[in-house]
């Protein structure tokens, strides 16, 4: 993997191009990875995604907690002319393997000295560094993150934070020794919660490795995934990230998985982060929210989210978002999507997911254009206030309006918590 910085400014982050493997098109950064569950874009088939969301090859974010059961089959499937993306129905797309699903809350606890818990649909699995590398060798992703203990957040005690760093170093010592058996690019995990000393220790361990040991960094341990990322305190997060970035070399990409709000995402990009995912778009859709925040300068006051369960829109025949050219907004109305919610039709979350992904991908295109003209601060201020007088709230409240348990899973899903 090769990362080339094309533009670097003090106030607007950096533009780059990520070349993951020979023959594949380069990916422009800041990059939005497509979050998947079990190898699929939530609610969307590969055909729908490629025909109605984007035809451009994407970087798919796969999680071991949702595809661990595929490792045995993939050990027999993988060959020189086909791989993990082909197996899940996305040929031509690149992929990165993470441990935890950023869309769902990761349970706390279950940590052992030599074992990392992996919470799957079948329950908790015990994952040693050796077993992890065996699974990575079977799955053969294009990029994979190093095994780490990220069971920390803003409330974690100092002892828990230090244990997360020490256990991660132990896991990574084994992975660095055996990475030559895996023909994939490794991302070094940076953990340590909200403790600058612990984060520095984690960074030093990565920097001590021989040149070429890994291709980039993944920042973990700021939240427990799911909706927790949408409500974290950016005033605590940003100083820690700035502290870490100042110690890292410029020529390696930096990933921060999780459902960070659009505003926090912009602030992280301003500090030099490069790779994000679409878990925020999913968390909004699964909790009956359409993304309606603007990133185009105008004189209208906007709201960041549209609650499609609100009876006030039952006779509103306007699109989810004015001037949006996604399939959902071109062919359907707010009243119709509200009707789909009321009747628990499966088309409801499909239309919301199509819209949210389309809108969020357009948002990242606007981010790259803003960085190119050194205008990220202006975009950040627009997203912060939406032309209003005060900062808007991008947090996502859990869905509490499921019509009945008997219908859960048939249309709009239960809350992402």
Swiss-Prot record:
Q: Name one GO cellular component term.
A: cytoplasm
**Compartment list:** Cytoplasm
Note describing how the cofactor binds: Binds 1 zinc ion per subunit.
Q: From which domain of life does this come?
A: Eukaryota
What does this protein need as cofactor? Zn(2+)
A GO term, aspect molecular function = tRNA-guanosine(34) queuine transglycosylase activity
- Keywords assigned by UniProt? Cytoplasm, Metal-binding, tRNA processing, Zinc
Q: Report any one BP term from Gene Ontology.
A: tRNA-guanine transglycosylation
Q: Which residues bind Zn(2+)?
A: 324, 326, 329, 355
Under the subunit heading, UniProt states: Heterodimer of a catalytic subunit and an accessory subunit.
Report the protein's function. Answer: Non-catalytic subunit of the queuine tRNA-ribosyltransferase (TGT) that catalyzes the base-exchange of a guanine (G) residue with queuine (Q) at position 34 (anticodon wobble position) in tRNAs with GU(N) anticodons (tRNA-Asp, -Asn, -His and -Tyr), resulting in the hypermodified nucleoside queuosine (7-(((4,5-cis-dihydroxy-2-cyclopenten-1-yl)amino)methyl)-7-deazaguanosine).
The similarity annotation says: Belongs to the queuine tRNA-ribosyltransferase family. QTRT2 subfamily.
> What protein name applies here?
Queuine tRNA-ribosyltransferase accessory subunit 2
């Amino acid at each position: 993997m090769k990362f080339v910085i094309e533009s670097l400014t003090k106030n607007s982050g950096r533009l780059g191009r990520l070349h993951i493997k020979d023959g594949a098109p380069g990916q422009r950064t800041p990059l939005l990875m497509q979050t998947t569950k079990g190898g699929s874009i939530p609610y969307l088939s590969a055909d729908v995604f490629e025909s109605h969301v984007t035809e451009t090859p994407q970087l798919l974010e796969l999680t071991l907690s949702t595809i661990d059961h595929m490792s045995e089959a993939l050990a027999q499937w993988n060959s020189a002319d086909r791989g993990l993306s082909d197996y899940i129905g996305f040929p031509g797309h690149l992929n990165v393997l993470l441990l935890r699903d950023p869309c769902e809350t990761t349970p706390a606890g279950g940590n052992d000295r030599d074992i990392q818990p992996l919470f799957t649909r079948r329950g908790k699995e015990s994952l040693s560094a050796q077993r992890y590398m065996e699974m990575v060798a079977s799955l053969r992703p294009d990029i994979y993150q190093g095994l780490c203990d990220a069971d920390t957040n803003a409330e974690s005690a100092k002892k828990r934070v230090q244990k997360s760093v020490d256990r991660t170093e132990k896991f990574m010592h084994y992975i660095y020794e055996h990475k030559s058996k895996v023909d994939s690019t490794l991302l070094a995990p940076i953990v340590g919660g909200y403790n600058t000393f612990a984060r520095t220790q984690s960074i030093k361990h990565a920097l001590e490795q021989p040149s070429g040991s890994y291709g980039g960094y993944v920042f973990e341990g700021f939240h427990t995934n799911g909706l927790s990322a949408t409500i974290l305190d950016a005033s605590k997060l940003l100083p820690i990230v700035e502290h870490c970035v100042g110690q890292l070399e410029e020529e390696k990409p930096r990933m921060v998985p999780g459902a960070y709000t659009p505003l926090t995402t912009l602030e992280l990009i301003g500090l030099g982060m490069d790779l994000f995912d679409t878990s925020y778009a999913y968390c909004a859709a699964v909790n009956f929210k359409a993304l309606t925040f603007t990133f185009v300068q105008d004189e209208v006051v906007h709201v960041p989210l549209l609650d499609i369960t609100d009876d006030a829109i039952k006779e509103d025949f306007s699109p989810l978002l004015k001037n949006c050219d996604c399939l959902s907004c071109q062919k359907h109305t707010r009243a119709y999507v509200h009707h789909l919610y009321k009747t628990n039709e499966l088309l409801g979350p499909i239309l919301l997911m199509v819209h949210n992904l389309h809108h969020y991908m357009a948002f990242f295109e606007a981010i790259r254009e803003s960085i190119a003209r050194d205008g990220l601060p202006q975009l950040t201020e627009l997203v912060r206030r939406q032309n209003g007088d005060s900062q808007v709230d991008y947090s996502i409240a859990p869905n509490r309006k499921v019509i009945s348990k008997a219908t859960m899973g048939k249309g709009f899903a239960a809350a992402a918590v």
